[in-house]
């Protein structure tokens, strides 16, 4: 063990049994409760997500190794570390700065920069801004259980990682936000290594687009691209098509006991963004007339299917209605042009859960085809390997597909009788470059100065094992189209 770090000054609250009231505290003051004899695991420590970003020069020499983490339900704030200093004789240099609720990181009296954070549930991001600075991006989180409470502030905070002061670069407030801002996703839309856009939703059901393309942070702005009524508590995913991006997210929450027991209908959305301000989607009164194509989800035993509807009604995107009690609380994973969405449904009064993993065609929200990245779901009727199954006419069925109603169809997903989370692993990925072919640019990885991300998101570069690994070490393998040895055209590769 080289380092043990506790952000002990982080503000939080505890329930005082003597007065039946919430009282202010810090993580350091609460640490003693974790060691008490009767402790039963009912307190939060540092349970938020974190992002790791290693920065190297064009010779692969390490320049920085940043870690930016959120407190989650353990406190109202975030912390930044520089792990490149972990081998130094003075470990105090590892700690860069903390971001705390109701504090002003630049130590002046300008209240416009004052931080108003709730519990920072989710995962922050790190990205390179247009000015050339590396920055940490933090959502305001949730201050109050009641979504309509004025204590919930909806804002995106951006901090300079070039120094140890935590100097604020920007505070972008959403004036009509509701319920607090959820985790953001950073996007490099032109794949040049710098962040242009951030997307994030709020618990009121809205999705926002933060424009970060100007080199002057004072000119950064935010607008609504989707208006709804269902809580958005996880970061969206992004899929890059020929002439637009698809912002993919689900609705639902499991933050509180009431949320876990809630069985209201929730949805998965794919909202088209072609950089035009007129493309706002309003689904607050339902799908009809919203410009969204509604695709229908069906389940046969444990296997999931989406229909292949395309009637021209989806000019602004698509939507999938989930079954009663299902919800989405984690960021989808995009593989080629398929979004794999983890869907949770609680049962047994919240003590148990089932998990559905659903692959969705990002272009229309519907069925998968042999030209899609697709799951190889369990089942006697599904081709598990090449030559495993044939049609009634003797034709070989592609891996991951099956014959159904005289046609070859590819199942969209599968339902597991257990609560699991998944992580995508690709045997052929030889580095951890954090910018994807779709432009998702804020996650963990090594950013090599001067390197450009791959642009192909239509086919796999070669044969290899690709899987969604579950946290219980089970897995759901993925297959899809292979790129040809000879390129026919740039259009085939990129679009």
Stretch-by-stretch model annotation:
Residues 1-495:
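A fold-level detector for beta-propeller and closely related beta-sheet-rich head/sensor domains
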């Amino acid at each position: 063990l080289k380092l043990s770090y506790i952000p002990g000054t982080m503000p939080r609250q505890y329930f005082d049994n003597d007065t039946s009231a919430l009282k202010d505290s810090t993580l350091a003051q609460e640490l003693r409760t974790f060691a008490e004899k009767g402790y039963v695991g009912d307190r939060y420590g540092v349970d938020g997500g974190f992002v790791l970003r290693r920065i190297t020069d064009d010779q692969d020499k390490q320049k920085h190794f940043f870690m930016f983490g959120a407190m989650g339900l353990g406190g109202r704030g975030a912390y930044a570390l520089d792990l490149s200093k972990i081998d130094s004789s003075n470990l105090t240099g590892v700690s860069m700065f903390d971001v705390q609720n109701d504090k002003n990181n630049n130590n002046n009296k300008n209240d416009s920069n004052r931080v108003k954070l709730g519990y920072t549930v989710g995962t922050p991001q790190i990205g390179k801004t247009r000015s050339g600075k590396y920055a940490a991006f933090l959502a305001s989180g949730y201050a109050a259980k009641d979504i309509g409470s004025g204590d919930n502030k909806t804002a995106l905070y951006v901090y300079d990682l070039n120094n140890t002061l935590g100097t604020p670069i920007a505070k972008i407030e959403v004036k009509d936000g509701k319920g607090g801002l959820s985790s953001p996703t950073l996007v490099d839309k032109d794949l040049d290594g710098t962040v242009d856009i951030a997307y994030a939703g709020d618990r009121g059901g809205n999705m926002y687009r933060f424009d970060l393309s100007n080199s002057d942070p004072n000119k950064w702005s935010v607008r609504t691209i989707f208006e709804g009524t269902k809580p958005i508590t996880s970061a969206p995913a992004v899929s890059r098509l020929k002439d637009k991006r698809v912002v993919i997210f689900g609705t639902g929450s499991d933050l509180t006991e009431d949320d876990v027991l809630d069985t209201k209908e929730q949805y998965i959305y794919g909202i088209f963004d072609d950089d035009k301000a007129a493309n706002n989607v309003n689904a607050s009164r339902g799908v009809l007339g919203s410009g969204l194509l509604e695709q229908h989800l069906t389940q046969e035993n444990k296997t999931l299917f989406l229909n292949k509807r395309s009637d021209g009604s989806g000019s602004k995107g698509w939507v999938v209605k989930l079954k009663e009690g299902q919800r989405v609380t984690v960021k989808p994973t995009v593989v080629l042009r398929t979004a794999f969405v983890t869907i949770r449904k609680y049962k047994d009064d919240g003590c148990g859960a089932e998990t559905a993993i659903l692959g969705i065609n990002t272009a229309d929200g519907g069925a998968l085809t042999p030209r899609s990245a697709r799951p190889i779901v369990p089942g006697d009727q599904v081709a598990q390997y090449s030559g495993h199954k044939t049609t009634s006419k003797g034709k070989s069925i592609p891996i991951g597909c099956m014959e159904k109603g005289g046609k070859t169809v590819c199942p969209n997903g599968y339902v597991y009788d257990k609560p699991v989370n998944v992580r995508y692993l690709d045997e052929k990925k030889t580095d951890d470059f954090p910018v994807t072919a779709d432009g998702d640019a804020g996650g963990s990885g090594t950013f090599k100065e001067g390197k450009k991300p791959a642009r192909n998101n239509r086919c796999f570069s070669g044969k290899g094992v690709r899987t969604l690994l579950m946290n219980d070490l089970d897995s759901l393998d993925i297959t899809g189209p292979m790129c040809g040895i000879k390129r026919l055209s740039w259009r085939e590769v990129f679009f």
